């Protein structure tokens, strides 16, 4: 069998895992694959995440957020052996799609969409606190601390906002960093 034939048989499947255990399920599955020497029947095992930046107490903090909490993506050839291997992993509830005995892969388009989203997120992290023009914010740091204002423009590349702060009865446009404001709930 040629390498091309082997690769073309692999499709992406979605596993449902206990929420909060996605990474452990992915790690355990990779270990099982290696122990059973079935690497040729499996491709990637992914927990789709994106890096988000949030401001906590005025400091920027990066963290990871799962796209699909409770799910793990597996690229694999579907047969009795691989099915049983995956089902034997602790905290795996089953496959999504198809029937319990004959799971259905996700479409190539769906897989490509997810993989492209993962690739885009390695370039630049998203901000957990997304701001939108017209939104009310409170300035927490700097000379305008404790003033309220309205978001006029948002620049995610630079992590800055243009906020119209009301001072002395006039709206004054001020450029601030994300860490200098908080949303008014």
From Swiss-Prot:
<keyword id="KW-0806">Transcription termination</keyword>
<keyword id="KW-0889">Transcription antitermination</keyword>
<dbReference type="GO" id="GO:0032784">
    <property type="term" value="P:regulation of DNA-templated transcription elongation"/>
</dbReference>
<dbReference type="InterPro" id="IPR043425">
    <property type="entry name" value="NusG-like"/>
</dbReference>
<dbReference type="GO" id="GO:0005829">
    <property type="term" value="C:cytosol"/>
</dbReference>
<dbReference type="InterPro" id="IPR014722">
    <property type="entry name" value="Rib_uL2_dom2"/>
</dbReference>
<dbReference type="InterPro" id="IPR015869">
    <property type="entry name" value="Transcrpt_antiterm_NusG_bac_CS"/>
</dbReference>
<comment type="function">
    <text>Participates in transcription elongation, termination and antitermination.</text>
</comment>
<dbReference type="InterPro" id="IPR008991">
    <property type="entry name" value="Translation_prot_SH3-like_sf"/>
</dbReference>
<dbReference type="GO" id="GO:0006353">
    <property type="term" value="P:DNA-templated transcription termination"/>
</dbReference>
<dbReference type="InterPro" id="IPR005824">
    <property type="entry name" value="KOW"/>
</dbReference>
<dbReference type="GO" id="GO:0031564">
    <property type="term" value="P:transcription antitermination"/>
</dbReference>
<feature type="domain" description="KOW">
    <location>
        <begin position="133"/>
        <end position="161"/>
    </location>
</feature>
<dbReference type="InterPro" id="IPR006645">
    <property type="entry name" value="NGN-like_dom"/>
</dbReference>
<dbReference type="GO" id="GO:0140673">
    <property type="term" value="P:transcription elongation-coupled chromatin remodeling"/>
</dbReference>
<dbReference type="Pfam" id="PF00467">
    <property type="entry name" value="KOW"/>
</dbReference>
<dbReference type="InterPro" id="IPR001062">
    <property type="entry name" value="Transcrpt_antiterm_NusG"/>
</dbReference>
<comment type="similarity">
    <text>Belongs to the NusG family.</text>
</comment>
<keyword id="KW-0804">Transcription</keyword>
<dbReference type="InterPro" id="IPR047050">
    <property type="entry name" value="NGN"/>
</dbReference>
<dbReference type="InterPro" id="IPR036735">
    <property type="entry name" value="NGN_dom_sf"/>
</dbReference>
<dbReference type="Pfam" id="PF02357">
    <property type="entry name" value="NusG"/>
</dbReference>
<keyword id="KW-0805">Transcription regulation</keyword>
<protein>
    <recommendedName>
        <fullName>Transcription termination/antitermination protein NusG</fullName>
    </recommendedName>
</protein>
């Amino acid at each position: 069998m040629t390498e091309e034939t082997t690769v073309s048989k692999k499709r992406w499947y979605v596993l449902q895992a206990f929420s909060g255990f996605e990474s452990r399920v992915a790690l355990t599955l990779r270990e099982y694959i290696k122990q059973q020497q079935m690497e040729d029947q499996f491709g990637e095992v992914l927990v789709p995440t994106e890096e988000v930046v949030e401001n906590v107490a005025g400091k920027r903090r990066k963290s990871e957020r799962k796209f699909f909490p409770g799910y793990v993506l597996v690229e694999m050839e579907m047969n009795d052996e691989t099915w049983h291997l995956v089902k034997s992993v602790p905290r795996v509830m089953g496959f999504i799609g198809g029937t319990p005995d004959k799971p259905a892969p996700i479409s190539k388009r769906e897989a490509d969409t997810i993989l492209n989203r993962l690739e885009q997120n390695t370039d630049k992290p998203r901000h957990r606190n997304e701001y939108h023009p017209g939104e009310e914010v409170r300035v927490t740091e700097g000379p305008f601390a404790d003033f309220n204002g309205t978001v006029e423009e948002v620049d995610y590349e630079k992590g800055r906002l243009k906020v119209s702060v009301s001072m002395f009865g006039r709206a004054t446009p001020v450029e601030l960093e994300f860490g200098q404001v908080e949303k008014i709930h």
